[in-house]
């Protein structure tokens, strides 16, 4: 039986670069995830939201990657705090996509809480498990004074998502602490994942003489080595 990792990531389209329109840093994580799955030849289905009508709804990216954008009928950037209103329609469309994969098994990986709602439901339906990337959590935001109209709903959903995920992927030690202290998640269910650091950030921008290490074209000056 062929196995697939199904990535559910409604609020980040990894094919759109960070800084384009409303696209933020979450896309950097999503793109890294997509690249690593392809790099290691892991069969996967990536599902995000179709933001613009000119974007394809399906792309066969590589022999191991099928990429889908589900059409929720609302073009352009939308506030990520309303994605839960599309839950039932999103679930229907994802089930429709997965029905094309006969005699296959699935493992779900969701990113951010509304996609976690889908992974929770679908994992139960397909009798499998899911892992979840947190990105942020409502209890911490509430502690720091952030105001959200949907905070109670979000906390309720996050408690369910976090408690039932096989693993939670955290971006920092502080996030691991938040999961343990605010959501009572056992440490064995928490994974600390990092992002690749670009080589430009591995060395200081200036040498000991105050000279710029990188020339105006952005290239490292190869004949000089600075510690």
Each language-model region and where it sits:
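N-terminal subdomain of nucleotide-sugar transferases
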Residues: 1-59, 65
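Active-site proximal beta-strand in glycosyltransferases
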Residues: 5-6, 123-142
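A short, charged, and often flexible helix/loop element on the N-terminal side
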Residues: 65-93
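Short N-terminal targeting/anchoring amphipathic segment
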Residues: 97-115, 119, 128-131
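A short beta-strand/loop micro-motif in the catalytic core of glycosyltransferases
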Residues: 109, 164-173, 191
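Membrane-proximal helix-turn-helix segments that form the acceptor-binding/catalytic region
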Residues: 150-168
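Carbohydrate-associated surface elements
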Residues: 174, 196
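Conserved donor-binding/catalytic core segment of Leloir-type glycosyltransferases
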Residues: 208-227
């Amino acid at each position: 039986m062929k196995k697939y990792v199904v990535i559910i990531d409604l609020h980040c389209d990894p094919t759109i670069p960070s800084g384009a329109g409303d696209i933020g840093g979450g896309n950097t994580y999503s793109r890294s995830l997509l690249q690593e799955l392809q790099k290691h030849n892991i069969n996967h289905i990536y599902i995000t939201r179709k933001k613009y009508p000119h974007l394809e709804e399906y792309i066969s990216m590589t022999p191991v990657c099928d990429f889908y954008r589900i059409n929720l009928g609302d073009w352009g950037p939308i506030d990520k705090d309303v994605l839960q209103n599309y839950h039932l329609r999103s679930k229907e469309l994802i089930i429709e996509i997965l029905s094309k994969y006969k005699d296959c098994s699935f493992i779900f990986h969701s990113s951010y809480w509304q996609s976690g709602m889908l992974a929770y439901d679908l994992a139960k339906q397909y009798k499998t498990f899911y892992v979840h990337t947190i990105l942020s959590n409502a209890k911490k935001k509430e502690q720091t004074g952030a105001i959200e109209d949907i905070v109670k709903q979000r906390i309720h959903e996050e408690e369910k998502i976090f408690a039932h995920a096989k693993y939670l992927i955290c971006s920092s030690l502080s996030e691991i602490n938040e999961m343990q202290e605010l959501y009572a998640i056992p440490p064995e269910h928490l994974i600390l994942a990092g992002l690749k650091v670009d080589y430009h950030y591995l060395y200081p921008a200036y040498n000991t003489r105050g000279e710029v290490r990188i020339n105006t074209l952005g290239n490292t000056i190869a004949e000089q080595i600075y510690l």
